[in-house]
Amino acid sequence: MAVQKSKPSRAKRGKRRSHDHVIQHALSIDKLSKEIHIRHHITKKGYYKGKKTLLFHLLSK
C-alpha cells in the first residue's frame, strides 16, 4: 500500500487544486426565437446566428 513520506504543503495543495474551478459559460439570446443559449452553440430549436441549421433538420427526423 502506498504511504506518503511527508504531508503535502499548503502551496502544493493549492497548486494541485488551481484547476478545480467551475467555468461559467457566456450566454446569448437568439435574435429570432429569443431563446437563451450558450454562445457559439445552436439553440434547442436548432437556430444558429438566426438561421435554422441543417444538422438539426437531419437529427430531428
Swiss-Prot record:
Protein's UniProt name: Large ribosomal subunit protein bL32
Top-rank lineage group of the source organism: Bacteria
| An example molecular function term from Gene Ontology annotations | structural constituent of ribosome
Q: Kindly state which keywords UniProt assigns to this record, in alphabetical order.
A: Ribonucleoprotein, Ribosomal protein
Q: Which parts of the sequence are annotated with region: Disordered?
A: 1-20
Q: Which GO terms describe its cellular component?
A: large ribosomal subunit
Q: Which InterPro entries match?
A: Ribosomal_bL32, Ribosomal_bL32_bact, Ribosomal_zn-bd
Q: Give any single GO term for biological process.
A: translation
Q: Where is the composition biased (Basic residues)?
A: 7-19
Regarding protein family, the annotation reads:
Belongs to the bacterial ribosomal protein bL32 family.
